[in-house]
Amino acid sequence: MVLGQPINIIKWIEENGDLLKPPVNNFCLHRGGFTIMIVGGPNERSDYHINQTPEYFYQFKGTMCLKVVDDGEFKDIFINEGDSFLLPPNVPHNPCRYENTIGIVVEQDRPAGVNDKVRWYCQKCQTVIHEVEFYLTDLGTQIKEAIVKFDADLDARTCKNCGTVNSSRRD
């Protein structure tokens, strides 16, 4: 086995910060059993990701807001600079990152047959308006692809309950 070299996170961010682009703003730094991502802000997401494995958040710079749906109730969890947070499996969550913020997120590779979901709730009445399910193999591209498709689909963005046309971008 050939081992990789340690990565100096501060230096990496200085040299590669331009790689953190909307709508997700992530870059997969390490892969293999786990994916370790550097995630910058601001991001432009209104989706809620549902992962059947836990997710670990470490806030390297600034504060982020992790919007979650906990037992049917919408809540905000603020993760401040220097804080870490372990999100349990199957919690719908929307990571809201602000300008000049940087976090590190660790996700377990998905076991065979275990799918992720990306879900959108109506921004007015909170009804589920759209959901896609897929086997996640690439955190760097697949969630972004789902967001781009949702953004282009007026029918998917229109709430059948109240008629609101929702944005794929966070207001």
Curated annotation (Swiss-Prot):
Name the Enzyme Commission number(s) assigned to this protein: 1.13.11.6
Signal peptide annotation:
none
* UniProt-annotated binding residues for a divalent metal cation: 122, 125, 159, 162
Keyword annotations for this protein, in alphabetical order, are: Cytoplasm, Dioxygenase, Iron, Metal-binding, Oxidoreductase, Pyridine nucleotide biosynthesis
Provide the reaction this enzyme catalyses: 3-hydroxyanthranilate + O2 = (2Z,4Z)-2-amino-3-carboxymuconate 6-semialdehyde
Keyword Plastid attached: no
List, alphabetically, the Gene3D superfamilies matched.
Jelly Rolls
Q: Which cofactor does it need?
A: Fe(2+)
Its pathway, per UniProt, is: Cofactor biosynthesis; NAD(+) biosynthesis; quinolinate from L-kynurenine: step 3/3
Compartments where located? Cytoplasm
- What is the protein name given in its UniProt record? 3-hydroxyanthranilate 3,4-dioxygenase
Q: Which organism is it from?
A: Candida albicans (strain SC5314 / ATCC MYA-2876) (Yeast)
Name of the gene this protein is made from: BNA1
